[in-house]
Amino acid sequence: MLHELLLRLRTPAVRDLAWTLLSPPMLGETTQVQRHPLQASCWTRQPQQLADWLAQQDSDASAVHAWLASKPVRRLGLYYERLWQFALHAAPDVEVVAANLPIRQNGQTLGELDLLLRDDEGEHHLELAVKFYLGTDGREAADWLGPGSHDRLDLKLSHLAQHQLPLSSRREARGALHDLQLDETRSAFWLGGYLFYPWPHYSSSPHGATPEHCRGRWLHQRNWSDFASTSPGAHWQPLPRLAWLAPALINAGGVWSDEMLQQWLNTLRPEAQAQLLVRLDEDRAGDWREVERVFLVNDQWPAQS
């Protein structure tokens, strides 16, 4: 359903909203419980209702724009959380009891509970994350690194298991949960995002990856010319970080010329942070749609500070 919706939806925030709600999880097999936040909602049982709601948001995006503007964020993970919060507040059979609830001990914040929900299946503490991991040369979670090479899939899963998910069960959380009339909260997580595979080399998916996970490729700056030559005449351009969720849709006036891309490449520093670029194809309406995405990393990656 997501593919068909993205052919119709045009508002960037609503496209990101649709991707957030409907894209597959990164992992299908996990040691900790993974639960879609809308699992018990009629929007999951009757997806046309969700599609209709998203179409309404696209025709009048004032509500989602107002929601996002009420608490502006610069980090992609927080933007992802805000989109989830907007949808869950609108879902007809899900109650958002609290979001980003701080848990403190002697005045010191131990952490925050991303979401506390109530639905037909009970009370839930959910941790949300969206991640972009680049594979090196193995199937272990430790072989999949964030674009900055500091984050790793195994570290994220460990942090979820050892800190984030148990937080709602700690003694320090009981008072806050009791005040919200939450007594038997079950913890779970939802991990969205993309896995990027090396070019020109090959890498297998990490253990437990969902077969239909969102994916791309990554390459070093030194390999760009060879990579670009595999799709001659293609239109490539970088995306700003907050535009990394849904596949890009760019109108004719926003597409870069070959000269603009070359100028950007010429000014890209050798030690630059990883850049996300998309390859765009023109559709029959004259819009340009993403058909491929790649991370361009510096030639020292992942050995960088």
What residue ranges belong to the model's regions?
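Intrinsically disordered, low-complexity Ser/Thr/Pro/Gly-rich regulatory segments
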Residues: 1-305
